[in-house]
Design a protein with these regions (language model features):
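Extended alpha-helical scaffolding segments
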Residues: 33-38, 44, 48-138
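Terminal domain-start segments
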Residues: 1-31, 118-122, 126, 137-138
Length: 138
């Protein structure tokens, strides 16, 4: 649904494409308990793309780093397929050679340490998805 409003299909922008960044910033300014759930729901089955999905990815990463317990609580309610889909979207990097990009590595390390400190098993899931993305980017 997210891309139906904020995405791009072929050469055509969707109705809210031009305001995607502002809308995500507005969402981030809301009440955190409601915001976490809404952004989590958007990210569960999201697929990375430039612009709006990228803005969403960055917003959710910020929330994970600030509210890891809340995100982990939501993830524990989901099945493994959704958990993997969520982390794949969060960790995805659209470039060959992701393993050599220091900014990407730093972001992964921040997420990994933040999550594994709270939940070792989920930290291993994060590590596994990261390694899969690295292999796929070669």
């Amino acid at each position: 649904k997210f891309l139906e409003y904020y995405g791009f299909v072929g050469d055509e922008p969707m109705p809210l494409y031009s305001v995607a960044f502002e809308h995500i910033e507005f969402l981030k300014s809301g009440e955190k308990s409601r915001l976490i759930g809404k952004l989590f729901d958007l990210a569960k089955n999201a697929i990375w793309d430039a612009d709006a999905p990228n803005y969403l990815q960055k917003a959710v990463i910020e929330l994970i780093l600030i509210f890891p317990d809340e995100i982990l609580s939501l993830l524990k309610e989901e099945d493994n397929k959704i958990v993997e889909s969520f982390w794949y979207f969060i960790l995805y990097y659209p470039s060959l050679g992701a393993e050599y990009d220091l900014g990407y590595q730093k972001r992964y390390q921040q997420l990994y340490f933040c999550i594994s400190e709270k939940d070792k098993l989920m930290g291993e899931v994060v590590k596994g998805i990261y390694n899969r993305i690295i292999v796929e980017s070669r």
